[in-house]
Amino acid sequence: MKRIVYILLLCAVFTSAKALPEAEHADTVLMQEVEVVAIKANGATLPDAVAATVIGRKEAEQLNIQALKGLSDVVPNFFVPDYGSRITSSIYVRGLGARMDQAAVGLTVDNVPFLNKDAYDFDIPDIVRMEMLRGPQSTLFGRNTLCGLINITTLSPLSWQGVRAQGEYGSANTYRASVSAYRKHSERLGFSLTAQASGTDGFFTNTYNGKKTGRERQYAGRFKTDWVASSNFRLTNAFFISNLNQSGYPYRSVASGQIAYNDTCFYRRFLITDGLTAALNISDKVSVSSITSFQLLHDNMTLDQDFLPQDFFTLTQRKREYGFTQDFVARSLNSGALTWVGGLFGFYKHNDMLAPVTFGDTGITTLIEDHRNASNPAYPIRWDERSFRLGSDFTIPTYGVAAYGQADYQLGEFTFTAGLRLDYELSTLRYHSQCNTGYTIYHDGEVFARVPVDINQRGRETRHFLELLPKIAVTWRPATDLSCYVSWTKGYKAGGFNTQMFSDVLQQRLMNIMGIGNAYDVDKIVGYKPEKSWNYEAGAHIDLLDRRLRTDVSLFFIDCRDQQLTMFPDGTTTGRIMTNAGRTHSFGGELSVEGNPTRNLLLRGTWGYTHARFHRFNNGQADFRGKAVPYAPSNTLFLQAVYAIDLRGDWSLDLDVHTTGTGKIYWNESNTLHQPFYMQLGASATLSYKDLQLQLWGENLTQTHFDTFYFMSMKNEFLQRGKPLRCGVTIRYNFQFS
């Protein structure tokens, strides 16, 4: 049945129609705008020696892309699973990624580099351009760009003036609305103001209380200023503010097949970012730029950590984080044989976090009392209170500085590139673990002793990281429509601290007080090392038939050292731990094709293949050599066909059908569980009249059943099901001032 639906929808696209307007290529962007990738690519739209996917405004609207998750599978070997809440911005590229703590892919929005991936997932209206650079970008962009960089640019008030409005409604009472005003105060000064709101009631139900999980309400605003003070100086500022409130987590027990848990779950986030970019041409040969940013993140994640109907324990993680970044960049403006770019970068991030775990009655009975009494039944214990708190407070200041440079030398048809970055980072953890409770020991039914438990432990840990991050590339451009490249780059993801293990540390210390178990050595488990990789890559960018057929192809091999992996400790523990695998090898390829067979029809397709395996990883209990790296798909696939019909007068109709494919995805290091390859079908029809658009759309039209996430808690297994069939309507209004 699914195959029939695919065939019918694909055939519908190829019906007869009038001419399609010229496809809006992704590089249709005001080149004079001050934009971070262009600054560091010596003014080019994108560097030649990189595998990159660029999505413009029109393609983003066709695919209804509003956030990073919309790029998943559209970009080859780029996967962002949609699970949990918006704090879980896990991104996997070419077999590598990160589920918690440090990001593996960098993100900049209007030149603001985000320091915490917990803030990555938010809706972005008025997108002009989305760039995904795959492979390490650490030489120019530094820490946490080991797998790549995402750069998003929104509309400038100097390039467009008017009012833009959008309203959307879909399945599960999902809605999205935004309105933007763009105005020129003068020919050189422009302002824009954007307000947006979105929400959903969620697609799944908690059978314990009959309530929907995944309910969301989000409100945001953006104010952007663009000032061209002179022909040599430009100043841009982008301010963004967002407030998010989400409920629940649709995690389904593998044993029962049900979403059923008793405690409250929610995620709340307040986010502010501001970025000021100044660019000055100090001569006809040299340009200098300054990119300054501030970001504030206040959030609270509270969840039923056991995700069962019983009252085991709950976890809260509440952060108060702020950060500053400063990037000074100088680059050559001449078009001679030698071009160069160099700079100094610094950042400071301060995080105050509270992460208490609260034990409930069932948790006390099962995890503590039963465990203790089994070892000494003659003297059983009973906890004095049926609820108590394991408190963990952290202060984590982190700062870093870096100096970097890169030069390109053109010799005939060849361009030789060499770059180097020296990156230093210092991170400190100050922790305070506390617990104030007690228990009573009985013997022959009588009180034998009362034992108070008063834990008050403070400590301080410091980690220094110093890295040299080189890059070497050679590009061959025998013609304007062909360029081939080979590159060798080093990627880097910063190390950090295992804050989520401190609840286990306290739990084990409690057991140790009662004479059972062994206490953790905090010094040994508190930190994890940086992740480093050597990336070997070859690729080509090919334009054929007067740019009616555009192809990008790349092959890569990655030698990753100390890969950071999230592990679930054995036993009835409450936390997760980040550990370093010894060595991982990943190789594969990517193919992107875009073409216009006729002026009516636009076809796009991407495919990514990754073979990522542990080359050396032994966790002390098992040897995982040769096993696939979990959570990263081995294949991504995207196919799209867009057909346009010019109707009478100012009316037009665009028909779009697309499909995505993902998998195989292994769920654990031993590769005993996996999600098979799956595909989803989407389609839209957009009716346009002058400044007005009406779009009908649907996703997962074949109602494909698949899982997006797997984890264990207290030896219990859980999965999250992917979103079911969804459909909706979107209205856009773009009124441009004359």
Where do the model's predicted regions map?
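Gram-negative outer-membrane beta-barrel transporters
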Residues: V341, Q410-E413, Y424, R548-C560, ...
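Extracytoplasmic beta-strand/coil segments of soluble accessory domains associated
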Residues: A52, K69-V112
